[in-house]
Amino acid sequence: MIEADRLIAADAQSEEEFLDRAIRPKTLADYVGQPQVRGQMEIFIKAAKLRGDALDHLLIFGPPGLGKTTLANIVANEMGVNLRTTSGPVLEKAGDLAAMLTNLEPHDVLFIDEIHRLSPVVEEVLYPAMEDYQLDIMIGEGPAARSIKIDLPPFTLVGATTRAGSLTSPLRDRFGIVQRLEFYQVADLQHIVGRSAHCLGLALTDEGALEVARRSRGTPRIANRLLRRVRDFAEVCADGRIDGEVAAQALNMLDVDAAGFDYMDRKLLLAVIDKFMGGPVGLDNLAAAIGEERETIEDVLEPYLIQQGFIQRTPRGRIATVHAYQHFGIDRAE
């Protein structure tokens, strides 16, 4: 099993980019949640515009699905400049990056998603571009090779990553602004679901929005995906109107429970509780018990369960916490 196969996967699915673009907020005024990030960016953007400068280079990091691309779009819109978008794996050669940099207009925003996946060769080209707005390019080969410098217009690099720790220190140190996105509160997700429903022309009550928000694992991308699936259910089974009861019925049918867990989450938790008496259990034994690869457990299933306090990793193995027992209504044997 891979993460993209799950309805509650935080990573973007191929068909979602166009749909998400239609409901994506365009300004900081429409940006819900992340109050500290929003407040800081409002000040930084206003200050840059007052000075007539490009915004300082911005690094955005955090779990997938929290709105890093959305924030990059908002920065460009608020600055009134163009947004050029690419990703680390796409920039294979130094020339790929040079082509993008030389086509920028003054103060434009260059957005590099998955910036931690830049190759060392491309990263070396980026250093003088970020620091001095200059591009160092080698022309020719062998003894005839020579370096030329090309002046670039002032621009803003916005880098996004889910793995800030994988960035090299020289690259990380060149970002003047660093923002971490946190998982969203249910109230903020309810607001986001309501706004998305309005953009999509859906009849959604506050209770319906709350039900979707509670099961969205703190992630707007998941909330919007669940909303679209609930819409399908409502159009067929409830005359298109989504209240709390309809949303709950739809999400139960989709096997997403009140905590946002799907079948695989529950299977893992129940294996620890029932088959290994709550743990500790080694990763290989747990993988064999649920019929999954150990990498799937470590990379796909465990992170959210650990973050929510349902599973603990210890030197002796995995342990189910009291929250896991309470979720299933099971008494914990002392």
UniProtKB/Swiss-Prot annotation:
SS bonds (residue pairs): none
Top-level division of the source organism's lineage: Bacteria
GO biological process, one term: DNA repair
Sequence positions that bind DNA: 294, 313, 318
Ligand binding (ATP): 23-24, 65, 68-70, 131-133, 174, 184, 221
EC number: 3.6.4.-
Region (Small ATPAse domain (RuvB-S)): 185-255
The entry's keywords: ATP-binding, Cytoplasm, DNA damage, DNA recombination, DNA repair, DNA-binding, Hydrolase, Nucleotide-binding
Catalytic activity field: ATP + H2O = ADP + phosphate + H(+)
Subcellular location: Cytoplasm
GO molecular function list: ATP binding; ATP hydrolysis activity; four-way junction DNA binding; four-way junction helicase activity
GO cellular component: cytoplasm; Holliday junction resolvase complex
Binding site for Mg(2+): 69
Head domain (RuvB-H): annotated segments: 258-334
Role: The RuvA-RuvB-RuvC complex processes Holliday junction (HJ) DNA during genetic recombination and DNA repair, while the RuvA-RuvB complex plays an important role in the rescue of blocked DNA replication forks via replication fork reversal (RFR). RuvA specifically binds to HJ cruciform DNA, conferring on it an open structure. The RuvB hexamer acts as an ATP-dependent pump, pulling dsDNA into and through the RuvAB complex. RuvB forms 2 homohexamers on either side of HJ DNA bound by 1 or 2 RuvA tetramers; 4 subunits per hexamer contact DNA at a time.
Family of the protein in this entry: Belongs to the RuvB family.
Domain comment (free text): Has 3 domains, the large (RuvB-L) and small ATPase (RuvB-S) domains and the C-terminal head (RuvB-H) domain. The head domain binds DNA, while the ATPase domains jointly bind ATP, ADP or are empty depending on the state of the subunit in the translocation cycle. During a single DNA translocation step the structure of each domain remains the same, but their relative positions change.
Record text on subunit structure and interactions: Homohexamer. Forms an RuvA(8)-RuvB(12)-Holliday junction (HJ) complex. HJ DNA is sandwiched between 2 RuvA tetramers; dsDNA enters through RuvA and exits via RuvB. An RuvB hexamer assembles on each DNA strand where it exits the tetramer. Each RuvB hexamer is contacted by two RuvA subunits (via domain III) on 2 adjacent RuvB subunits; this complex drives branch migration. In the full resolvosome a probable DNA-RuvA(4)-RuvB(12)-RuvC(2) complex forms which resolves the HJ.
Name assigned to this protein: Holliday junction branch migration complex subunit RuvB
Organism listed in the record: Edwardsiella ictaluri (strain 93-146)
